[in-house]
Amino acid sequence: TLLNASKATNFNFKIEGTSLSDEDIAKINSLNPTRNKVIERYKAITKKGCKLIFDKVDNSTFRNNLIMLDGDLPSIIANLLLEQLNSGVSTLKELVEQITETNPLGYDTEQASPFYAYKIKHLLTSAALGMMPATAWSGKFDANGGYLVVKKDGEILCYHFYDRNRFEDYLFSNAYLERSSTSRHEYASIIKENDGTLSFKLNFQVRLK
């Protein structure tokens, strides 16, 4: 696991559009199919004429770690999480390709610069080499000479830091988003805040194939 699910990796979205009654909220929160529970709850929200608008990364430490890597990373990850719900795709490379097409952050794409892929590769590498969501990060890597990857079949891959591009490409090609349990971390439930606004949390958990 590159990034484990925890409250620190919650991304908070505001539900905007048609107002939802307490009955609507209870009904959506009670949706509990054996598969695709989060997608079904998301679809129920959108069917009511609502949409999710990214609000913030809940944990200030993780938020600061992401901003230190790149100020746009919180918004990029939020768009990846929404794209996963809309498309059903979970591999990070495919999700990045899809948001590169839609370009939600409005980057200048005239020269086909790989903005989204570059930033996500930087995040994956940093997570692999020491950056943890709930710990303030200095920007220094834990490993000095290289990195060993033990695959599920027992094969061991060795990447030296002078070959960082290959290491980044390996992570990028093999990383996928995994949904954590909806019974933990206030994940994928509609929450009525004290100010009356409605929140819906998505969790950012990254594993390797």
What does each of the following model-derived ranges do?
Residues 1-209:
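Short, positively charged
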